[in-house]
């Protein structure tokens, strides 16, 4: 229609519309819808760009939730996927892993206590892990303590080494921030068999706070999958590409953890944020598979 109008500028719009069997009003309504659709796409892309300044690797499903929740933009998942794909904004997952566990240390280890436990509240099970960052030619390490029920990072520490005192600082942060209503209830502390978590000082701190000690029993990463998954999100969705100095790394990690805890919707939490679930203790429905068959049988009850 636009081409015909350009070729025949003296022919009235209603005459051209008559050639195709529709009215002048229908033509202008269609034109307006096309304009509004284009404007809506531009608004969506502008808002996605704004969101990704804080959540650089957020995918389509989570962007859909944040667009509706925080900006009132209600767009279908498939439509948003098409918009993102056409704009070249779809993300590829980063698949890199570096071993940070040394279990041949000869210190006492503990059995895995969480094989047949489905957490029913916050501060029931904490899982821990260490991830590394390459900054200005040096390896830096982030020690994380995560609440298994809510997926919230409750304690963390950035360090230039893997000594147990850094793991202790992360655990102390988690203990200080415990929800008051659960402080008198026991916490199961689950980790791999790394020397940091088996050290005398670390075990002493756990026992001081009446924590039950649980550790992985083999080399299968699925035995500590929640901790490794959260570490991967923090590292790959928020910290890479890592263009920061060593002196600025602490603040960068702080902002990343805040964005993850307080703003990023979580599929396994019915698209709530970890902080919301941790603070409210609301019931969530597990939407992920577990390594242990007992877990999976409970998930289908």
Language-model features, listed with the residues they occupy:
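Short, amphipathic alpha-helical "recognition" segments used to contact nucleic acids or chromatin
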Residues: 1-10, 45, 49-53
